[in-house]
C-alpha cells in the first residue's frame, strides 16, 4: 500500500536559497501539489543576492520535471543517468535574471554507457538541462588500452568533447607531492577541475592577472597579494545551511586556489622561456611562504594545497587578458553574452543595436554577440596544436600547481590520435583534462566563434560606438551582492 502523503505545500515569499532547498527536499519525499502565487514575480529586484528575480516559473519547472522523473521510475531506484539529469535540472533553474548562478561537474563510472552517451546526437533539443554539467569519466587506475580507446573514440564521436578525464589516482598522487596533505581520500574536483577536493569541501579562489610587461618581481608581488586574499577568505567557514562536515573539512585543510590568468600574454610564462620551470617554482614558493605567515597571524591551519590555474572565462573578459592557460580564441571572433529579457540592461543593449537573438535553450533569455579583435602580439588557440597545449599544461602541473591546471585542449582531427597517445602514455599524471573540437562542435550559440577580418569589419559597421547608460536603472541593487568567485553558489565560468 502506498503510504506517501499527498498534501498542499504553500510556498511563502522567497528571500533566500535555503527555503528553496527545503521545499525541494519535500518534493523528493512526498507526493504533493504546490501553489507559487506568493513567490515574488519575475523581474523583482533582489537586494541581498543582487540582480533580478526569475519568478516562480523555474521552480515550477523543476517540480514538474522531478514529478515526471519519479513517476517514470515508480517501483525501482533511479538510474545514474536519471540522477545526473535531476542534478542538471536543479543547476538549470538556479538563475538570477537569466544569469546562471550554478556550476556542475558530473563524475561517472568509466563503463557507464548511458552517461557516456548523454551528450551524443541532438541532446540539446531533447535534454537541454544536460548542458549545465561538465561530464568526466572517473578513473581509479590507468585503464587497459582497449577501454581507453573506446572512451577516446566516444569523445570524438560526441563532438561535444565529452566525457573528459578525471583520475582519482592521479589526484591522490598530486595531493601527496607537497607532504602537507592527507592523500588517502576519495578526491573529486570542482566544476572547472582545477581544485582537488575531498567530498563535502569548497574551493577558495583568488587570481593573479598576468600582464605582458610583468617581471619576476612584479609577479611575486601579485602572487603574494592573491595569497593573502585567499588566506583571509579561508577564515570564512560559517556555512549555516550545510551539514557540519562541510565546515570541518574546510577548516581542516584551509584550501586556497591561487591562480594565474593571462599566462600566454607574457613570454616569461610560456615555453619560449627555457627557465620556465624554475620561475614557476619561485612563484609557488612565494605563495607557500606567504600563506604560512598569514595563517599563523590568523590562527588557522596552513593550507594543504595552494596553487592552481583556473579557466578564468569571466575575469579574463573583465581585465582583457588571455583566459587562464589558454590562448586567445582567434585574431577575430564573436564573444556571446546572455541576458534576461526583463533585465533593464538587456533593453539598453538591444535598443543600442547590439546584435542579439533568442537563446535556443531559454526563450526568456537573449544572446548578444560582440565582435572582438585580439591584440596584435597575442597567442591564439587557433594557432596552437593540441600537443603544444598539453606540453604547457604539463610544465604548470609539475612546477606551479599543488592542485591542477584547468585546461580545455582544443583539437582537430589531424592531431586527435597523437593527443590520445600522449594522454595514455602520461595517464598516471593526468588528474583532469577536458577536450573540445576547435570547430564543428555540437554547441549552438557557443561563447566563442572564430570569424574572418572581413566579417569582423562588417559587424563593426553596424555596432554601436557608445551606450547611453543614463537609460539604465538608477537604483543600486548590487549592495550586499558582492559574491566572490565560487562562493555562495556563484562560479565565474
Predicted regions: what they are:
Residues 29-34, 73-85, 94-106, 234-248, ...:
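Flexible, glycine/charged-enriched surface loops at secondary-structure junctions
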Residues 55-58, 82, 184, 194-201, ...:
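Secondary-structure capping and boundary motifs in well-ordered enzyme cores
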Residues 98-142, 237-243, 262-311:
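Internal maturation/activation junctions in enzymes
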Residues 155-158, 164-167, 174-242, 252, ...:
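Catalytic alpha/beta core of large soluble enzyme barrels
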Residues 477-493:
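Short acidic, low-complexity intrinsically disordered linear motifs used
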Amino acid at each position: 500500500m502506498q503510504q506517501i502523503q499527498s498534501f498542499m505545500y504553500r510556498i511563502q515569499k522567497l528571500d533566500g536559497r535555503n527555503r528553496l532547498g527545503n521545499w525541494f527536499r519535500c518534493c523528493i519525499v512526498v507526493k504533493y501539489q504546490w501553489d507559487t502565487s506568493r513567490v515574488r514575480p519575475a523581474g523583482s529586484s533582489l537586494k541581498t543576492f543582487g540582480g533580478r528575480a526569475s519568478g516562480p516559473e523555474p521552480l515550477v519547472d523543476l517540480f514538474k520535471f522531478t514529478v515526471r522523473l519519479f513517476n517514470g521510475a515508480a517501483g525501482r531506484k533511479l538510474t545514474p543517468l536519471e540522477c545526473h539529469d535531476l542534478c542538471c535540472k536543479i543547476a538549470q533553474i538556479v538563475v538570477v535574471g537569466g544569469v546562471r548562478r550554478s556550476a556542475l561537474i558530473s563524475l561517472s563510472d568509466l563503463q557507464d554507457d548511458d552517461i557516456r552517451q548523454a551528450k551524443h546526437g541532438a541532446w540539446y533539443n531533447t535534454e537541454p538541462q544536460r548542458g549545465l554539467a561538465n561530464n568526466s569519466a572517473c578513473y581509479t587506475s590507468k585503464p587497459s588500452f582497449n577501454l581507453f580507446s573506446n572512451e577516446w573514440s566516444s569523445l570524438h564521436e560526441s563532438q561535444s568533447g565529452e566525457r573528459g578525464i578525471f583520475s582519482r589516482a592521479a589526484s591522490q598522487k598530486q595531493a601527496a607531492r607537497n607532504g602537507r596533505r592527507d592523500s588517502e581520500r576519495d578526491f573529486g574536483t570542482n566544476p572547472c577541475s582545477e581544485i582537488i577536493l575531498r567530498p563535502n569541501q569548497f574551493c577558495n579562489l583568488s587570481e593573479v592577472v598576468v600582464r605582458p610587461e610583468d617581471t619576476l618581481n612584479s609577479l611575486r608581488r601579485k602572487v603574494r597579494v592573491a595569497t593573502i586574499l585567499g588566506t583571509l577568505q579561508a577564515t570564512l567557514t560559517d556555512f549555516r545551511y550545510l551539514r557540519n562536515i562541510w565546515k570541518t573539512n574546510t577548516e581542516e585543510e584551509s584550501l586556497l586556489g591561487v591562480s594565474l590568468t593571462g599566462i600566454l600574454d607574457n613570454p616569461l610564462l610560456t615555453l619560449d622561456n627555457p627557465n620556465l620551470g624554475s620561475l614557476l617554482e619561485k612563484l609557488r614558493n612565494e605563495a607557500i611562504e606567504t600563506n604560512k605567515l598569514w595563517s599563523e597571524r590568523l590562527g588557522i591551519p596552513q593550507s594543504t594545497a595552494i596553487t592552481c590555474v583556473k579557466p578564468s572565462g569571466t575575469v579574463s573578459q573583465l581585465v582583457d587578458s588571455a583566459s587562464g592557460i589558454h590562448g586567445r580564441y582567434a585574431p577575430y571572433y564573436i564573444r556571446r553574452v546572455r541576458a534576461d529579457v526583463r533585465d533593464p540592461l538587456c533593453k539598453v543593449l538591444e535598443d543600442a543595436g547590439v546584435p542579439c537573438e533568442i537563446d535556443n535553450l531559454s526563450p526568456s533569455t537573449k544572446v548578444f554577440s560582440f565582435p572582438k579583435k585580439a591584440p596584435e602580439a597575442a597567442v591564439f588557440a587557433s594557432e596552437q596544436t593540441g600537443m603544444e597545449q598539453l606540453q604547457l599544461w604539463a610544465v604548470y602541473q609539475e612546477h606551479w600547481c599543488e592542485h591542477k591546471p584547468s585546461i580545455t585542449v582544443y583539437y582537430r582531427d589531424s592531431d586527435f590520435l597523437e593527443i590520445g597517445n600522449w594522454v595514455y602514455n602520461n595517464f598516471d599524471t593526468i588528474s583532469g583534462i577536458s577536450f573540445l573540437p576547435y570547430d564543428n562542435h555540437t554547441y549552438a550559440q557557443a561563447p566563442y566563434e572564430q570569424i574572418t577580418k572581413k566579417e569582423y569589419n562588417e559587424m563593426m559597421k553596424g555596432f554601436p560606438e557608445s551606450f547611453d547608460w543614463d537609460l539604465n536603472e538608477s537604483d543600486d541593487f548590487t549592495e550586499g551582492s558582492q559574491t566572490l568567485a565560487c562562493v555562495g553558489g556563484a562560479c565565474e565560468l
